[in-house]
Each structure stands twice: as structure tokens, then as C-alpha cells.
Amino acid sequence: MISIDPLTQLNNRNRMEQHLFECVRSQDLNMYLLVLDVNRFKKINDEHGHAQGDLALKAIANCLKESCIEKSDFIARYGGDEFVIVYKGNDVKGLCQRIHAYIKKLSFPFDLDVSIGWAPYHKDIHKWNDWFIEADKQLYNEKKKLKDR
């Protein structure tokens, strides 16, 4: 089965689900799940074209691969304009700040940024999708804050 997203060259959703299943089975308490979503991505595609949207996704993927995570971490394109990171460090807030800083440095004819939701793994998580739901709820809260500004 193909496990690489053809646009970003990141792990794809199928590989992500398999990896999250393995993470939950390992019960390693030193992990965080981050869900990232590109802010105003529909507007980027509508106003600048899908080719620019694709370039933005590739640039974000490269930023995450090369600058923001350690080799022991896992990154995937969940789908559309969403990315997932399994982070095995202990400074998740610092990681989020680094991600925002690196993305801000990218040069595009439009504002490019992401919202990030994250959740630590804990002993009450028994299924990978429960962990994902926790991080996704935090992402939703971040997106709501952005809209309220």
C-alpha cells in the first residue's frame, strides 16, 4: 500500500493512522499529537489559484520536515490543508512557536499561517482516534479564536 502523499512527500493518512495505532499501543507517555490546519486556505485557492495553494502546502511540508521536528518525530499530511505531527519532545509550546516562526518566513504573495491544536498522550487513551479527537478539539478552539479577532 502506498504510504506517501504525492504532493508533499510526507506520510499519508493511511500511514498516519497506522502510526497512531502503534503509538497508542506503545503507551509511551512522552508523546504529543499536533493537528495543523492552514488558515484561510480556501481564500488562498480562490484568490491566487490552486497552483499557489499547492506550492504553499509543499512549502509548509518542507518547513515541518527540515526545520521543526526531530528525526524521532512523525509527520503526515492528513488531507487537504491539514497536517499531523507526533512529537516526542517535552516542549510542545516551543515547537508550536517554532512552526509559526518558520512559516512566517516563507515568501508568498499572501499571508500564510497555520492553527495548531495539540494533545498529550495519556493512559486514558485506548484508541488512536480518541487522541486525534482531543487534538482536533484544540485545533477547533484555535480556529475559533482566529475568527473572533
PLM features: residue spans?
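Catalytic-core segments of nucleotide cyclases and related cyclic-nucleotide turnover enzymes
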Residues: 50, 93-100, 104, 120-149
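Active-site-flanking beta-strand signature of metal-NTP-handling nucleotidyl enzymes
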Residues: 32-37, 75
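Conserved nucleotide-binding and Mg2+-coordinating catalytic segments in signaling enzymes
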Residues: 1-18, 36-50, 58
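Short, conserved catalytic or interaction motifs in soluble domains
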Residues: 46, 88, 144
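Cytosolic nucleotide-binding catalytic cores of signal-transduction proteins
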Residues: 28, 55, 63, 77, ...
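Short regulatory alpha-helical coupling segments
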Residues: 11-30, 61-69
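GGDEF/GGEEF active-site signature
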Residues: 59-124
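PAS-family sensory domain
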Residues: 29-31, 73, 148
